[in-house]
């Protein structure tokens, strides 16, 4: 049998029908649903007189619009409230494998709760009406975001029409330096590839530095794959994967567990398999990263400087840098460490898991929020993460430092609730996108790791977190 990449194994095992032009009908194992992209899909089903094909594939929660404070007040914005109430009505009507509504103790970001309850299992195809579904590729799943019309299609048929992607291996070998995390790897990769470098590809992340990461770190890497333009991000199964899933509520039990593990261990790229493209990075050379512009590819090391467009020969790229600098209110050649921070956001489906909160707390412990920093939001990714963090006393560390400890949700990542920036404010954010207006109209987002965000919070500007040790 011809050697296959991990992506090729996942793809071929889910093809229901193959067209001559390469388009295939792919079976979907897990359908994640939230309140923003599902109402129209459910309405379309009703208008067509259809019912969901397999409700046992559905895991649903409210996350984008839910407030992260004063839950007793409910959802004040009428549009947000309507979306959450519509999700609730739809799921209660049709059913689901798991549903965590607003105020449920397990409610949280869909890409956090899926893995933590064992709804995300190796070998699955996973879709959601959300760009960062690629997160689940950390479990050797073929996972990607879909549009609202595709949400309806999956509900109705449990299948999707797809074009096969090309394959790319991003190999990161070596040992990460102190203070450097998975988020820094992800940003360094995007800085290398650009936001279009992965277009048309499914990226497998490999190498000794990736294998050394926890599942939380691998989820961060795969979460950001979409920001390099990739269709999906993947990491092969190893003992770290298996240990993480053991005893999760929805993971197989008993003999079924042993059978599942035997299959999961095959979910890796075969020796001799060919990738369409290979990119290599040296982990030891990766430093803490900070984005300075309005795209994740506009990234520098914390010891670097904002670029000078005058030195850029390509007129299109030069114009893009000029526009970004104008929006961000930055002068060319400004040292990254001199960029002031007005707000800090520690959260999102990229960096809101327990390991991320521990990382931030280790920096915040014994320190206080800088007077110039208006607000620091710490938003756990789920109710279970919040409970564990509180059991470890992490919330007390944050509160003692003057940070705000919030309820779970998407929060300031995309400002669909009340958590947002004011025009002109700079934010050190552990989220995944720094587009214009992403965290509020006129807000200026800088993407960083949890440790770097906490460091900026206590100093008032960006600083190499290694200097605070």
From Swiss-Prot:
It is an enzyme of class 4 (lyase). InterPro entries: 3-IsopropMal_deHydase_lsu (IPR004430), Acnase/IPM_dHydase_lsu_aba_1/3 (IPR015931), Acoase/IPM_deHydtase_lsu_aba (IPR001030), Aconitase_4Fe-4S_BS (IPR018136), Aconitase_4Fe-4S_dom (IPR036008), IPM_dehydratase_rel_enz (IPR050067), IPMI_cat (IPR033941). Pathway: Amino-acid biosynthesis; L-leucine biosynthesis; L-leucine from 3-methyl-2-oxobutanoate: step 2/4. It catalyses: (2R,3S)-3-isopropylmalate = (2S)-2-isopropylmalate. Its EC number is 4.2.1.33. GO terms for biological process: L-leucine biosynthetic process. CDD domains: IPMI. [4Fe-4S] cluster binds at residues 349, 410, 413. Binds 1 [4Fe-4S] cluster per subunit. GO terms for molecular function: 3-isopropylmalate dehydratase activity; 4 iron, 4 sulfur cluster binding; metal ion binding. Its cofactor is [4Fe-4S] cluster. Keywords: 4Fe-4S, Amino-acid biosynthesis, Branched-chain amino acid biosynthesis, Iron, Iron-sulfur, Leucine biosynthesis, Lyase, Metal-binding. Pfam families: Aconitase. NCBIfam families: leuC (TIGR00170), PRK05478.1 (NF004016), PRK12466.1 (NF009116). HAMAP family: LeuC_type1 (MF_01026). Catalyzes the isomerization between 2-isopropylmalate and 3-isopropylmalate, via the formation of 2-isopropylmaleate. Belongs to the aconitase/IPM isomerase family. LeuC type 1 subfamily. Heterodimer of LeuC and LeuD. This is 3-isopropylmalate dehydratase large subunit. The gene is leuC.
């Amino acid at each position: 049998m011809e050697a296959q990449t991990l992506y090729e194994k996942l793809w071929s095992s889910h093809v229901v029908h193959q067209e001559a032009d390469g388009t295939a009908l792919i079976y979907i194992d897990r359908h994640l649903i939230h309140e923003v992209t599902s109402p129209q899909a459910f309405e379309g089903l009703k208008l067509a007189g259809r019912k969901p094909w397999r409700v046992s594939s559905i895991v649903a929660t409210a996350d984008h619009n839910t407030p992260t404070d004063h839950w007793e007040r409910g959802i004040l914005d009428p549009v947000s409230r309507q979306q959450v109430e519509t999700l609730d009505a739809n799921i209660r009507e049709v059913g689901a494998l798991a549903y965590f509504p607003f105020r449920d103790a397990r409610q949280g970001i869909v890409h956090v709760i899926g893995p933590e309850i064992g709804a995300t299992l190796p070998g699955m195809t996973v879709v959601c009406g959300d760009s960062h579904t690629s997160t689940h590729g950390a479990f050797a799943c073929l996972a990607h975001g879909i549009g609202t019309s595709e949400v309806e299609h999956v509900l109705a048929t449990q299948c999707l029409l797809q074009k096969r992607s090309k394959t790319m291996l991003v190999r990161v070998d070596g040992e990460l330096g102190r203070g450097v995390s998975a988020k820094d790897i992800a940003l360094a990769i995007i800085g290398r590839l650009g936001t279009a470098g992965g277009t048309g590809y499914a990226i497998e992340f490999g190498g000794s530095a990736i294998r050394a990461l926890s599942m939380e770190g691998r989820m961060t890497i795969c979460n950001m794959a979409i920001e390099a333009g990739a269709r999906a991000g993947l990491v092969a199964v190893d003992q770290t994967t298996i240990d993480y899933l053991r005893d999760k509520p929805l993971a197989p039990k008993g003999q079924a567990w042993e059978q599942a593990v035997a299959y999961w261990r095959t979910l890796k790229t075969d020796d001799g398999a060919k990738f369409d493209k290979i990119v290599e990075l040296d982990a030891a050379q990766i430093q803490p990263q900070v984005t300075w512009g309005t795209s994740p590819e506009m990234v520098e090391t914390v010891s670097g400087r904002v670029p000078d467009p005058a030195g850029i020969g390509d007129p299109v790229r030069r114009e893009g840098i000029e526009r970004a600098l104008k929006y961000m209110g930055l002068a060319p050649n400004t040292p990254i460490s001199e960029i002031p921070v007005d707000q800090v956001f520690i959260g999102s489906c990229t960096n809101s898991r327990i390991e991320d909160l521990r990382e931030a707390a280790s920096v915040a412990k014994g320190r206080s929020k800088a007077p110039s920093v208006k607000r620091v939001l710490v938003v756990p990714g789920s109710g279970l993460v919040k409970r564990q963090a509180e059991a470890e006393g992490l919330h007390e560390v944050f509160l003692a430092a003057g940070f705000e400890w919030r309820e779970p949700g998407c929060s300031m990542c995309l400002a669909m609730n009340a958590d947002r920036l004011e025009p002109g404010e700079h934010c050190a954010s552990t989220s995944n996108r720094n587009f214009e207006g992403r965290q509020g109209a006129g807000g200026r987002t800088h993407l960083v790791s949890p440790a770097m965000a906490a460091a900026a919070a206590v100093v008032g500007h960006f600083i190499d977190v290694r200097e605070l040790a």
